[in-house]
């Protein structure tokens, strides 16, 4: 199994192709994404939506526990 995957991250105003590690917690991934693409934003509660697979991954989960693969379209959803 590969240690990284290439995904398309859907932001508010654009889609961005990024390479991410498979062994990362959702909470940490979203913090890193916000640091790079949305400085100054602090989210309270959120999850990842894997659009093309209909998956929702809670902030306390690890990506490696789910069938995320290269080519997936991902959105961050605040709840």
Regions found by a protein language model. Give the residues of each.
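Ubiquitin system architectures
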Residues: 1-79
């Amino acid at each position: 199994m590969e240690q990284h995957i290439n995904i398309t991250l859907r932001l508010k105003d654009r889609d961005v192709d990024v390479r991410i590690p498979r062994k990362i917690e959702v909470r940490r991934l979203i913090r890193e994404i916000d640091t790079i693409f949305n400085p100054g934003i602090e989210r309270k509660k959120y999850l990842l939506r894997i659009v093309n697979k209909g998956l929702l991954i809670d902030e306390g989960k690890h990506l490696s526990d789910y069938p995320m693969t290269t080519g997936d379209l991902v959105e961050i959803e605040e709840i």
